[in-house]
Amino acid sequence: AECSVDIQGNDQMQFSTNAITVDKACKTFTVNLSHPGSLPKNVMGHNWVLTTAADMQGVVTDGMAAGLDKNYVKDGDTRVIAHTKIIGSGEKDSVTFDVSKLKAGDAYAFFCSFPGHSAMMKGTLTLK
């Protein structure tokens, strides 16, 4: 089973994919995020955040209030299944999470929680 994915977030506010499938044979799953653009993280920073589809908007709203120092993710937010830090031009970050946290048939969303980005930078994650 392929238990990781490489994703890029660019200066055009786009992720390189809008759908991720996690094989249920995987014990853990790793997301490797990179930023091929030229803009710094305070201007065009990106992260990768995973929640249920239902929780996405609330996490985005609370993340905006948390600010850049907290990677636009509220401290101790139990709705967040996994997240990377905010990265800028030329930077990378990875996150690994337990696949046991996912349920087959549930709808999951991944997105960038940098203010204003989630409308374009989002996708679905499915356990198969």
Curated annotation (Swiss-Prot):
The SS bond pairs are none
Whether Repressor counts among this entry's keywords is no
Tell me which residues make up the Plastocyanin-like domain: 1-128
Q: Where in the cell is it found?
A: Periplasm
Keyword set, alphabetical order: Copper, Electron transport, Metal-binding, Periplasm, Transport
Residues that hold Cu cation according to the record: 46, 112, 117, 121
Q: Which GO terms describe its molecular function?
A: copper ion binding; electron transfer activity
Domain of life according to the entry = Bacteria
Q: Which GO terms describe its cellular component?
A: periplasmic space
Q: Describe the function of this protein.
A: Transfers electrons from cytochrome c551 to cytochrome oxidase.
Q: Kindly give the NCBIfam families that the UniProt entry links to this protein.
A: azurin
* Official protein name in the record: Azurin
